[in-house]
A protein has these predicted regions:
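Short, extreme N-terminal leader segments that mark the start of a protein/domain
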Residues: 1-31, 35-37
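A broad, low-specificity signal for short, low-complexity segments enriched in glycine/proline
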Residues: 3-9, 16-17, 50-58, 78-81, ...
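Short, flexible active-site loop motifs that bind/organize anionic cofactors or intermediates
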Residues: 8, 44, 148
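N-terminal start-of-chain detector that recognizes signal peptides
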Residues: 16-20, 26-27, 63-68, 90, ...
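Long, hydrophobic N-terminal alpha-helical segment
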Residues: 22-48, 55, 61-63
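Residue-level signal for secondary-structure boundary elements
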Residues: 34-37, 66, 70, 118
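A glycine-rich, hydrophobic loop/mini-helix early in the fold
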Residues: 48-90
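Long, charge-patterned amphipathic alpha-helical coiled-coil/hairpin "stalk" segments used as oligomerization
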Residues: 79-156
Length: 156
């Protein structure tokens, strides 16, 4: 089996076909995401992405927004970078704090966090590289509550 590292137009179902399988696929994706979720501390959760999780995200965005082919191009451009390419893990990192005052204060002190994440597996320490689509820390030093990071492992 070949590892799929990018979504194409051919992978995406039209809205009518997607509606027929949506509930089944949703259940499968929810179950898979539970196994790909790692809580780190009281507020941070890493959601490790895959071809399937990004396929589902694109399908759901198209379903909700109904933007047609123009939207599909944008969604593929936005989500393809989050599909792992070989020897890497890609994570969506979410800082989840219900209280807006605590969340604002917490994120204000977290600027640059996207450059300080790492993962250690079998003694190998891999520093995260943030997705470069937009700055995830603003000029005032406040971090975004959602970060996208890549962990690129060596070929050894």
């Amino acid at each position: 089996m070949t590892l799929k590292t990018a979504l194409t137009r051919e992978d995406i179902l039209d809205l009518a076909a997607y509606e027929k399988i949506r509930e089944q696929r949703r259940g499968e994706i929810v179950a898979a995401k539970k196994l790909r979720r790692v809580a780190v501390g009281p507020y941070a959760t890493f959601y490790f992405e895959s071809f399937d999780t990004m396929w589902y995200q694109v399908q759901e965005m198209l379903r909700i927004e109904k933007g047609g082919e123009a939207q599909l191009t944008d969604e593929l451009e936005a989500y393809n970078p989050l599909i792992p390419k070989g020897k890497e893990l890609v994570a969506t990192v979410m800082f989840e704090i219900d209280n807006p005052d605590i969340r604002t204060a917490f994120l204000a002190g977290l600027g640059g966090v996207e450059d300080r994440m790492m993962i250690k597996i079998n003694g190998e320490q891999v520093i995260a590289k943030s997705e470069q689509d937009v700055d995830r820390t603003n000029a005032a030093g406040k971090a975004s509550s959602v970060q996208f990071v890549h962990f690129n492992f060596s070929t050894d």
